[in-house]
Amino acid sequence: MQVLRHSEHTLKTALLSKNPDLVSQYEKLDAGEQRLMNEAFQPRNNLFEPITLHSQSDWISSHPEAPQDFEQFFSDRYRKAPCPKKHIIYIQPIGFLGNTRVISEEYIKWLKGYCEAFFYGLKVKFLEPVSVSATKCSFRVNENTQNLQIHTGHILAFLKRNKPEDAFCIVGITMIDLYPRDSWNFVFGQASLSSGVGIFSFARYGKDFYTSKYEGSVKVPQRTVSSDYSIFDNYYIPEITSVLLLRSCKTLTHEIGHILGLRHCQWLACLMQGSNHLEESDRRPLNVCPICLRKLQSAIGFNIVERYKALVKWIDDESCGESGATPKSSSEHVYLPKPVEAFKDWREWILRCIAVLEK
């Protein structure tokens, strides 16, 4: 295990920059916002922890990358930011996301509300779910795990063709596992930053995926015909638990963060850290560090305390929308509270940040 501790000077420079104009820009921020972000380089800061590497298989150890400070983010000429003509985050479900239509709709509402709070100030719109066959993507049964997988490159091409004119980006989400090419076992997701499109799967976030109890394996191994999408009829969808919801929110916001121009964070424990495996992804916090928070604020223009309060409200609102759901049939109407148990510690952390902002 290794703890990555940067010096106060390094973190301060990464946050403020050496560019006098960017330093001046920082000094014009609200006093509370400066106070919170300055926690990044305070010796006894207890809000933003250093990064801890647990093994050589962790992302930073196995994927060396140059770090991105605020100045590099701000001056990146290839970075795309939302503008009045392209300001909406579109999310395209591929197939159903819940084991009934109503549960799928509730889950979509929860994700939409979370994204709107996290990217406070941007609009988030969910498009009507499309079937796998509508994308005309290639697919396969994984030879090792015997679960269904769809081809990321073909999904990205479908999303690019169907990207609305006012979209800042469009991201596809699915409960079906993904693969980028025949030689790969799987991939959690893939994005094209230049095109503003991405596709991400939550299939491996179910509680049983990595156990012998996993129910999503195709029972009888079979050769798939590229045009026969009937294999996806009644495909397995994991239960929407609090942990699965948390993992989904993490992945969605991390990847949209990339589309906004944020690279993998190497400064402090942060949502924007890379992850090589599910265990490492679970260790990542839901929050962004002060350096990435400044990047996000610069791209979107939100008030930080209002953003944090919106996130607390999302956690406290037990249900988004009036409809309920049932695990038995989509016609039965049962109240479905939002499963936010896994978010409770983060809620307390946000309240501590709000206290610093409003001091």
From Swiss-Prot:
It comes from the Eukaryota. Zn(2+) 1 binds at residues 254, 258, 264. GO terms for biological process: proteolysis. The active site is at 255 (proton acceptor). One of its GO terms (molecular function) is metallopeptidase activity. Its cofactor is Zn(2+). Binds 2 Zn(2+) ions per subunit. One is catalytic, whereas the other seems to have a structural role. Its EC number is 3.4.-.-. Zn(2+) 2 binds at residues 265, 270, 289, 292. Signal peptide: none annotated. PROSITE patterns: ZINC_PROTEASE. InterPro entries: Archaemetzincin (IPR052009), MetalloPept_cat_dom_sf (IPR024079), Pept_M54_archaemetzincn (IPR012962). Keywords: Hydrolase, Metal-binding, Metalloprotease, Protease, Zinc. Belongs to the peptidase M54 family. Probable zinc metalloprotease. This is Archaemetzincin-2. It comes from Rattus norvegicus. The gene is Amz2.
